[in-house]
Amino acid sequence: MVSGLDTQTPYTAPNSACVEGLAAGNSVTALRASLKAAGNRVYTAPAQNGPGEISSTSGFGPSSQCPTPLPASMTINTTGSINDGGQNLSTFLTYLHTAFGINTVDLVGHSMGGLFARSAIKTLKDSSSSVTVRSLTTLSTPWTGTYPADYATGKLPITACLNQPSCVQVLTGYKKLAASEGPRGAASIISTEALQGPSGFNARQADALKGIPVTLIGGDHFTRPGGLPPLWPSEAVVGLQSALATTLPDSAL
């Protein structure tokens, strides 16, 4: 399991998780429990909202007394670049192969975690890795960009919210996050332009997902008739159009 933008997720294994607080951070704990209950062997990829390893999480729903943290080289920086995160994720998957004999994985990525997973898949394929990705499932992943990033980078006016209070709150809060990370931070590099431009992330990925079944899931809790499709409907941060990659060619999937 791979968490998304600005998240903290400690490394956990099927029989090893955090003892105090949430088992695996506030982003993926519930889904981890559901997948384990269904009989899956579940590992959470370590992720930190900054460089370095992670031994516990802070903020809402903290986790502590977690399994021994893995090195920074295996830990995704959820405020950094997609490709750096993908490289560290691929290193983590290689570790699972070396340490536990895992040859095949199903990746589940939440939000930006889906982009980290896509980048890791390309890295594994390009290096002829011994690890095979059997499937990819993305949950509200901004395949073609996210409208708060478009607002933060000056490409979308706040009037696109159509005076919807939660939308205005999301955009203003997101812009503060993007400003704190800087123009190369994760919050800015998942804009429509950065992902969909001629030399953007999607173009560079080419056919990396060829032969891999992909399941895309998005949310539509917030909607406004007549609103801009990249924004409405959405689950609050990622529009359904982007989460379902409706404007991407089939070859990209």
Feature locations, PLM:
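N-terminal non-catalytic accessory region
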Residues: M1-V108, M112-P157
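Helical cap/lid subdomain of alpha/beta-hydrolase-fold lipid enzymes
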Residues: K122-L253
